[in-house]
């Protein structure tokens, strides 16, 4: 088959630049149709009468005969299409809803070839292969059963829509329930109920957090000026309300012992860690669930002190962060060493340094500066009282005597 038997598609649209030197046929009446709109055969051509391809309907008997329709569909009307040199106009997305119901569909128009080589390949392949239309049974299986527009709100075609409009769900209010598929109905209702319960729990948590005041800064947590500060710092062993910034500042201070800073500022109950949360949790079960989520999330982050085995974590096996080696394997928790102090107390330590002993000895041997100053002032007063009155005081007392 030569290229002269294939109609030049660029000539049909009036954009052929080769003119008489074109290798394709510029006579629509003598050439064979080179393009058949496969989307029109499925009933899903979104371009309607503005389609550049031939609209060929399937015969009523389902055989090999064709019924030509649409723009340039008949061979007799091909010359009219070529003489008119109709230009292709792309249909806007919002105008697709105004197309007739028979041309509505979800498939997208196939792009036209950009080069002459693509045109040759497309024309030869479409003319040489057998024009056997696809069976409608296979096409109906590919089409969605439920109308996608009715499922998300409103369908423009309503009763004239070629798709099935499902039953309305009582929870979400959308037409997404298939009347012929009980399994799909039960699955959707189950998912809707789970989503509804999650939304209700979130609404209760928001309402519970509206009037919670931080016990340190005395401000309503959810009404702070900086949006990043509108988070609660929930203590693992306490139910007092603190904002995350205040409780972290309290636990990071170095002016007190570790036992004091880990305790609640109000009830003095020690908590191992602080849980950041957008909502306040008072129920103990919800709090335990929040703690488990916090531990699982933190356990995936690498520990900055361990540093993949290059450093030493002061928390040892109690650390909530991930202790992993460079190859990804988890490291065994370090066994902290025990040290017995001079006062009989036992402390755990991972590393022993000489400076720790020197610093501890100085803290125990040297008295506090304030206490030392108080002792000096008391000794001075005692010495003055024991030494008797001064000469000036004695002279003043003698003058005042009668």
Swiss-Prot record:
The keyword Transport does not apply. A zinc finger (C3H1-type) spans 2-29, 31-58, 141-168, 297-326. The gene is mkrn2. Keywords: Cytoplasm, Developmental protein, Differentiation, Metal-binding, Neurogenesis, Nucleus, Repeat, Transcription, Transcription regulation, Transferase, Ubl conjugation pathway, Zinc, Zinc-finger. E3 ubiquitin ligase catalyzing the covalent attachment of ubiquitin moieties onto substrate proteins. Inhibits neurogenesis and axis formation during embryonic development by modulating the phosphatidylinositol 3-kinase (PI3K) pathway. Acts downstream of PI3K and akt1 to up-regulate gsk3b mRNA expression. A zinc finger (RING-type) spans 214-268. It comes from the Eukaryota. Its main location: cytoplasm. Pathway: Protein modification; protein ubiquitination. It comes from Takifugu rubripes (Japanese pufferfish). Residues 169-198 are annotated as: Makorin-type Cys-His. GO terms for cellular component: cytoplasm; nucleus. It is an enzyme of class 2 (transferase). Its EC number is 2.3.2.27. It holds the Pfam family zf-CCCH_3. One of its GO terms (biological process) is protein polyubiquitination. The lineage of its organism: Eukaryota, Metazoa, Chordata, Craniata, Vertebrata. InterPro entries: MKRN-like, Znf-CCCH_3, Znf_CCCH, Znf_CCCH_sf, Znf_RING, Znf_RING/FYVE/PHD, Znf_RING_CS. It is found in: Cytoplasm; Nucleus. SUPFAM superfamilies: CCCH zinc finger, RING/U-box. Transmembrane segments: none annotated. It catalyses: S-ubiquitinyl-[E2 ubiquitin-conjugating enzyme]-L-cysteine + [acceptor protein]-L-lysine = [E2 ubiquitin-conjugating enzyme]-L-cysteine + N(6)-ubiquitinyl-[acceptor protein]-L-lysine. This is E3 ubiquitin-protein ligase makorin-2. GO terms for molecular function: ubiquitin protein ligase activity; zinc ion binding. Disulfide bonds: none annotated.
């Amino acid at each position: 088959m030569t290229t002269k038997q294939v109609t030049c598609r660029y000539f049909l649209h009036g954009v052929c630049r080769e003119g008489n030197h074109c290798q394709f046929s510029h006579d629509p009446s003598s050439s064979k149709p080179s393009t058949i709109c496969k989307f029109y055969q499925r009933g899903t051509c979104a371009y309607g009468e503005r389609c550049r391809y031939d609209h060929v309907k399937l015969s009523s008997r389902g055989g090999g005969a064709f019924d030509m329709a649409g723009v340039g569909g008949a061979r007799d009307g091909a010359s009219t299409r070529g003489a008119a040199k109709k230009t292709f106009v792309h249909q806007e997305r919002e105008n697709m809803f105004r197309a007739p119901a028979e041309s509505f569909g979800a498939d997208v128009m196939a792009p036209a070839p950009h080069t002459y080589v693509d045109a040759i390949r497309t024309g030869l392949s479409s003319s040489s292969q057998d024009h056997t239309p696809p069976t409608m049974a296979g096409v109906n299986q590919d089409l969605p059963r439920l109308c996608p527009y009715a499922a998300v709100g409103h369908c423009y075609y309503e009763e004239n829509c070629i798709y099935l409009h499902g039953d309305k769900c009582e929870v979400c209010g959308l037409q997404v329930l298939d009347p012929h598929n009980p399994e799909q109905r039960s699955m959707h209702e189950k998912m809707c109920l789970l989503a509804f319960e999650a939304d209700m729990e979130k609404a209760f948590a928001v309402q519970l957090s509206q009037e919670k005041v931080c016990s340190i800064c005395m401000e309503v947590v959810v009404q702070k000026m900086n949006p990043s500060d509108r988070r609660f710092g929930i203590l693992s062993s306490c139910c007092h309300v603190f904002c995350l910034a205040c409780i972290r500042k309290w636990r990071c201070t170095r002016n007190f012992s570790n036992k004091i800073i880990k305790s609640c500022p109000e009830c003095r109950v020690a908590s191992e860690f602080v849980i950041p949360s957008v909502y306040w949790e008072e129920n103990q079960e919800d709090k335990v669930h929040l703690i488990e989520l916090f531990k699982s999330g933190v356990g995936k982050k690498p520990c900055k002190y361990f540093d993949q085995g290059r450093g030493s974590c002061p928390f040892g096996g109690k650390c909530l962060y991930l202790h992993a080696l460079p190859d990804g394997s988890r490291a065994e928790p370090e066994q902290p060493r025990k040290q017995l102090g001079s006062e009989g107390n036992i402390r755990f330590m991972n590393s022993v340094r000489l400076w720790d002993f020197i610093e501890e000895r100085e803290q125990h041997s040297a008295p506090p500066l304030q206490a030392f100053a108080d002792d000096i002032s008391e000794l001075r007063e005692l010495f003055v009282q024991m030494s008797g009155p001064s000469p000036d005081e004695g002279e003043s007392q003698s003058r005042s005597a009668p």
